[in-house]
């Protein structure tokens, strides 16, 4: 199979730019013949990517088939404010040569949830529409759990500033975390496979640890004598409060999903597909919570406050 041409939609965004950066590394470049960054406008970021070997195409709802011309693999990283645009892009795919499509998932596996939420419902709708519109294109949903860089903060109960971690439910329940860079490196392996052999769902986990274990890791890195206080709140009461006061953002929902083991991408949890990419040329190793602890002196998001 010849090396594919790969396009990243939303390639200058938070996740998209990290994926592009990883795909541009020397270990990934031989795996595809062209890397195309799809962006709404030129910017310092697009010029930087061009200088590193990527092609840049400016796209809009009016030129999507042309923007995707010659593309074999499409990685969609368009964010939550772009659902209408994502649908337009999906409707353009039958007019293209795309053979493998990674929709904008990359977080938690919300298909196991038993409650509605606007953000995740929009992703479910997108997937159902994709099944209808592009039955001949392989669709692979990649779930990374929580992003390692963004998750050990007070929004998920990790209140570093006040040396207090609060778990919902048991502090010994494991949750999976994956760095955005590792998502990019994993995609760099998956996109080179025969599309028919790419799983419809891929659960990744750079590291899987409990709140109690993370507290110990951060304490060891900070070297502070008093250490982090670990407490827990009632899962039933917390979940009832969240449902009684719905929010458009997912943070509070994610906290009880952590407690229920629904972000546990291990063999004992939702399953783990790390073996699909581990051992591939240049993949290296996953970034861990110990790595994050060393980088931050045991104090990730140490100045952050949260309501």
What are these regions, as identified by a protein language model?
Residues 37-96, 108-114:
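NAD(P)H-binding glycine-rich loop region in Rossmannoid oxidoreductase-like domains
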Residues 99-105:
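Short beta-strand elements of ligand-binding domains
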Residues 30, 69, 96, 137, ...:
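Structured loop/turn residues at beta-strand edges in well-structured enzyme cores
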Residues 227-237:
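A generic structural motif
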Residues 77, 104, 145:
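Conserved residues at the C-terminal ends of beta-strands
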Residues 235-307:
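A hydrophobic C-terminal alpha-helical subdomain
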Residues 2-33, 38-45, 84, 109-227, ...:
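Oxidoreductase cofactor-interface core, primarily capturing Rossmann-like NAD(P)-dependent enzymes
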Residues 5, 72-73, 100:
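Structural motif
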């Amino acid at each position: 199979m010849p090396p594919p041409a790969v396009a990243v939609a939303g390639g200058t965004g938070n996740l998209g730019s990290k994926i592009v950066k990883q795909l541009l590394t020397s270990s990934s470049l031989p795996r595809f013949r062209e890397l195309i960054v799809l962006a709404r406008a030129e910017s310092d970021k697009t010029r930087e990517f061009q200088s590193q070997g990527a092609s840049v195409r400016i796209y809009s709802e009016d030129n999507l088939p042309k923007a995707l011309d010659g593309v074999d693999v499409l990685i969609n990283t368009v964010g939550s404010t772009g659902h209408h645009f994502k649908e337009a892009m999906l409707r353009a795919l039958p007019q293209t040569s795309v053979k493998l499509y990674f929709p904008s998932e990359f977080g938690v596996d919300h298909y196991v949830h038993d409650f509605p939420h606007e953000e995740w419902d929009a992703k479910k709708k997108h997937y159902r529409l994709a099944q209808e519109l592009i039955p001949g294109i392989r669709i692979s949903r990649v779930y990374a759990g929580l992003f390692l860089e963004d998750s050990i903060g007070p929004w998920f109960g990790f209140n570093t500033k006040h040396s207090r971690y609060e778990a919902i439910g048991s502090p010994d329940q494991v949750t999976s975390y994956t760095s955005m860079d590792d998502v990019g490196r994993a995609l760099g392996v998956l996109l080179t496979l025969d599309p028919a052999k790419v799983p419809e769902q891929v659960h990744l986990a750079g590291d899987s640890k409990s709140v109690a274990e993370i507290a110990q890791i951060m304490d060891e890195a900070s070297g502070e004598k008093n250490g982090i206080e670990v407490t827990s709140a009632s899962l039933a009461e917390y979940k009832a409060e969240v449902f009684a006061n719905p929010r458009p953002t997912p943070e509070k929902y994610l906290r009880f999903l952590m407690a229920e083991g629904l972000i546990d991408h291990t063999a004992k949890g939702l399953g783990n597909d790390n073996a699909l990419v581990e051992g591939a040329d240049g993949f290296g190793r996953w970034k861990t919570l110990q790595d994050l602890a060393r980088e931050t002196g045991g104090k990730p998001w140490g100045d952050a406050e949260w309501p």
